[in-house]
Amino acid sequence: MSEQPLKIAIGIATAGRREQLALTLQQLVGQTLPPNKVLVCPAAPEDFDDSALPDVGGPVVRVTSPRGLCAQRNAIISQVTDCNVLLFIDDDFYPAPDYLEQLARLFVMHSDVVIVTSHPEHDGATGKGLSHQFALEALRVHASRPSPAPAGLRDTYNGYGCNLSVRLSTVFAHNLRFDENLPLYGWLEDVDFSRCVAKHGRVVTCQSLYGVHLGTKHGKSSGVRLGYSQVSNPVYMMRKGSMSWAFGTKQIARNLVRNLTRFFNAEPWVDRRGRAKGNFLALLDLAVGRVSPNRILEL
């Protein structure tokens, strides 16, 4: 690493998960390279209890913002002008103790890289979700394994929002931000942001960056709104040019098929009927020329 280690900030946008957020902050204790600071932007004041914060090695700062993942993440960006790298994590992502140290090494060694991400070995977002205890055990098992050789980088289309780090010099030089026309949970906001940043460097994934994503279901938005966003947001991104037509149409088709084929046999943790209804409403709006990500605010 360089003589002056990179200053890395951690940003967490959160909504309706006060207890889970507290557990996640506790998991940031003991990083082999402590964060320069941790910024938490809650959707509502009561979503973040800052009365008794753990010692993560740097200050934990409350950031205020209007509700909405993109707006909250942009508010965090505005507070990290003194840092080199910003790592966004979900409020239910537990990074391994060496995560920040490895991340700093990657950004120093690869000056052409602008976004680094990883796809967790254990990701509750793809199923019913993982428990806190499961995540702790997975981290323990990982720590007991021999340290692997540094994994190579692999170029990828976009960063994964649950752990997405960005080189801040690129962000500020080109005035890059999350698109606040994607309201509330900002479906596919990580793809949109990544493709905008990708114009200025490489977007890579590195599996040696280990963490566990619980995929907590508490605090999720309605199925109807999500279903609408599954159509409206890719259409919006394709039209503005941040998402390829091939990628966007594949996203829409995949979600339509999933929601329809599982309509009568849905997973207990997924509102397939609500999502299918939202898909249908968005397709109707697309047909009459009024489809827009912001329409979910009316549903």
Task: Give a label for each model feature.
Residues I12, G16-G30:
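Short, well-formed alpha-helical segments that are part of the catalytic scaffolds
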Residues L25-V63:
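Acidic donor-binding segment of Leloir-type glycosyltransferases
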Residues N158-V166, T170-L176, E180-L209:
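A short, conserved alpha-helix in the catalytic core of glycosyltransferases
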Residues N181, Y185, R202, C206-V224, ...:
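Active-site donor/metal-binding and catalytic loop motifs
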Residues C70-V85:
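Active-site nucleotide-sugar/metal-binding loop of Leloir-type enzymes
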Residues A135-Y157:
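Short, flexible, basic/aromatic active-site loop/helix in glycosyltransferases
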